[in-house]
Amino acid sequence: MSKRRVVITGLGVVCPVGNNVGDSWKNIINGVSGIAPIDNIDTEGQVVKFGGAVKNLDISHYLSPKEAKKMDVFIHYGMAAGIQAFEDSGLEVTESNAERIGVAIGAGIGGLTTIEKTADLFREKGAKRISPFFVPSSIINMISGNMSIKYGLKGPNFAIVTACTTGTHNIGDASRIIEYGDADVMIAGGAEMSSTNCGLGGFAAARALSTRNDDPETASRPWDVDRDGFVLGDGAGVVVLEEYEHAKKRGARIYGELSGYGMSSDAYHMTLPSEGGEGAARCMKNSMRNASINADQLDYINAHGTSTPAGDIAETDAAKLALGDHSKKIVMSSTKSMTGHLLGAAGGIEAVFTTLAIRDQIAPPTINIFNQDPNCDLDYAANEAREMKIDHAISNSFGFGGTNGSILISKI
């Protein structure tokens, strides 16, 4: 049976460097950091006092006040990015095609803001004061649910939750649904808003975060010898995936083809990557096999690249293991150096950035590489974007629990 081809026809982003695709991509290419001191919560007593917040998003452009009131902030971000992507695609939903359009937008953690506020309310005033909207405003699948309700989409409606791999797994599994013929169009990605007291405090307690409070803009420094952890970021990234012939028939603008998808498990440790990047390497190999390309055809990797001491070395080793000698010829950069780590939304925004890298034939930079770690010896597009030929690119996501995902996007 021949595989149905899947293409990308819509993009949407809300993130620390911009509230739409155009602004975000311009800032990414220019190496603009979105990391700054946190001002949405009181950081008194917090070890870490900075992050990658979404700035000045006017949610009224996307939701009515009544709708917005019933949703946690992470749903706001997911809806904004989802609506952007839907409008960018030019899709028209009709009675005849509604059952062939679905949604798969997840989050790694979900409605922390609502959960924390409700817990405080319960302690202060008791259970009777809990809002009837508490549960539907905080559970992860409600971005997909609200998107399907807004546009009358009657196809598959779900949300995968796999920590930092959430966005990539939602996009990858959505592509499989189209390949298998269960839908013609899927709106897919991830969202997150974890810059709350518990979110910030929890990751700091796990010693996962950079503590560079005196210089937030340079705190996320993948592959730099002085990296000391990741920077927490918020936002959402969503793509519209579409069966190739369906997209051509309606005259859609096609950004690129989602030609491959790979998954793997480290089966090693709750938070640390497997030794030598073995699990991540298998994941990348699986995506290339699924795309029917050889390692020497790959041009660019949008890395997981979180700026953690162990993770950056493991991903470097994984690229060498997956690509062999060709690893010395590709460019592998981390846009997290500018956005921070958006957890469940990371794979979503990075799928958008990888798609745009192919469209514009330019690799985003990894900023803040001041002194490259000798154990990380690949080409990371240090501090400056790189104009180059990109026919095939991988976007990597690796999450707590040893869950790995890679999508491979190709020029079309």
Regions found by a protein language model. Name each.
Residues 43-53, 110-114, 193-220, 262-282, ...:
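Active-site-adjacent elements of ketosynthase-type condensing enzymes
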Residues 85-97, 247-254, 284-300, 322-326:
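Phosphate/pyrophosphate-binding loops at sites that engage ATP/ADP/AMP, CoA/4′-phosphopantetheine
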Residues 1-67, 245-255, 352-366, 410-412:
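ACP-dependent fatty acid/polyketide chain-elongation machinery
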Residues 1-8, 95-98, 291-297, 328, ...:
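Flexible, low-complexity linker/loop segments at domain and module junctions
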